[in-house]
Amino acid sequence: MQDGRLDPKYFRRNFTGVDRHWYDYSVAGMRRAVLSGTCRGANIPGIEVCGKTGTAQNRGQDHSAFMGFAPMNNPKIAVAVYVENGGFGDAYGVPLGALIMEQFINGRLSASSAAKANVFQHRRINYGGYER
């Protein structure tokens, strides 16, 4: 980023060589995950969010992951959230990713999302016996 503008290379389309059918299939599955799966917490009124959770096993607490993009048919933002020792993907990854997308797309958080953000600012994660 220079002078508040993204490098033009980020606007260039890249082609993977994968048949479009598989892309559409994956997007539909990611949308369903937000509507009725593990990503339900990423639902943002008026925005079609697509996402996928992940959980990485760890000796201690599992790591929480979420990847998503929005809006579905004309993406403006893609996020990847990875919270060490955050538990399942829907524990930290999904809600934090949803807050980031809502703020970016709408330019602000709704009252309920602002309240959720406030809760997350005060949550602590235990790292190997140390709370951070």
For each predicted feature, which ranges?
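Active-site beta-strand/loop architecture of penicillin-binding DD-peptidases
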Residues: 1-17, 21-111
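Short, highly charged C-terminal tails/helix-capping segments
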Residues: 111-132
